[in-house]
Design a protein with these regions (language model features):
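Signature of N-terminal electron-transfer/Fe-S-associated modules in redox systems
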Residues: 2-167
């Protein structure tokens, strides 16, 4: 029994071994001593103090933790520091699409606001790829973001309004 415990302890110790991780977040370079398997969500929130990215489910199902990795939306709760090495990471704090943020405000999208960072990050990735997204593209791009308050019609209206302004 003691042998199993010591083996478990060694495995646990090896899996939490910290190493130097260099991240490029919102245009700045950060060096952290952290486990490369650590989800970037925890590095952002607990180490760097960038709390705009929210913890929702921890399983990549709700979209509250959506960030951009080299311009693509990813779930920060599932993406490790190691996967982010050498790539550009953008959080809600670094999102510079003011037109999209204005459309969100004009349509009163946020209610409780908890999911909005993830919603905006998914929407920003969509309009970067498709400046005038179709209804189908909006539905597809936003399908991975859950809103407990049910502001889906407002989200769609905000994105449609954004598309009209781009036209």
């Amino acid at each position: 029994m003691a042998e199993v415990l010591s083996t478990t302890a060694v495995i646990k110790e090896a899996s939490t071994a910290a190493s130097t991780q260099t991240l490029f977040i919102n245009g700045k370079s950060f060096t952290l001593d952290a486990d490369p398997k650590m989800p970037i969500l925890w590095a952002l929130r607990d180490i760097l103090g960038l709390t705009g990215t929210k913890y929702g489910c921890g399983a990549g199902l709700c979209g509250a933790c959506t960030v951009h990795l080299d311009g693509q939306p990813v779930r920060a709760c599932l993406t490790s520091l190691g996967q982010a090495q050498g790539k550009q990471l953008t959080t809600i704090e670094g999102l510079d699409n003011q037109k999209l943020k204005n459309a969100w405000a004009e349509h009163n999208v946020p209610q409780c606001g908890y999911c909005q960072a993830g919603q905006l990050m998914s929407a920003a990735a969509l309009v970067a790829q498709h400046p005038k997204p179709s209804e189908e593209q909006i539905n597809s791009a936003m399908s991975g973001n859950i809103c407990r308050c049910g502001t889906y019609p407002r989200i769609k209206a905000a994105l449609q309004n954004y598309a009209k302004q781009e036209g």
